[in-house]
UniProtKB/Swiss-Prot annotation:
Disulfide bonds: none annotated. Keywords: Membrane, Transmembrane, Transmembrane helix. The keyword Cytoplasm does not apply. InterPro entries: TMEM205, TMEM205-like. It is found in: Membrane. The chain crosses the membrane at residues 18-38, 53-73, 89-109, 168-188. One of its GO terms (cellular component) is membrane. It is a multi-pass membrane protein. Its main location: membrane. This is Transmembrane protein 205. Belongs to the TMEM205 family. The keyword Nuclease does not apply.
Amino acid sequence: MVAEGDPGNLVRTIHLLVLSASWGMQCWTTFVAGFVLIRGVPRHTFGLVQSKLFPFYNHIVLCCSFISLAIYAAYHPRELLSPSESVQITLFFVCLLAAALHARWFSPVTTKTMFKMHIIEREHSLGQGVGLSANREAYQRLQEKDPKYKALRQRFMRYHGISSLCNLLCLLCNGANLVYMALLMPTL
């Protein structure tokens, strides 16, 4: 007979710490770090810093997503899931899937494409301006006169957009799971 187990205080604490640490890191990276950095350093420096930090960030989110799903699934047998528990385990799974796609496919392609763009931009003395609006006209002219750069830019924007959506999806799933957990807490 399938039975729902009591995870005990240690497992519950680990689960809450992993989920909240992941969500906090996602909030910081998504809403603070990138915006502060892009306004403070040259564009190519920003890309280089992102290329070094994001693989760690993406894989930490992936590991935290796996741990959260594994702990939750271990103590909530499929046969005994309530509708709200079904939603919660689905959110954990969606987060894991989005984190895996982000870490293993979309983010690496975005980074490789960005570095190819940097090579062309350096040839045209671009990339040292601070902020997204620096030399906007020069980037536009480069796109118009260089079809290879234009294609790279389109590829970069497509993969960067999908990568950002995966990140936001994980952020929303983890946030919703934290809300579910908070609503189930008997007291503070």
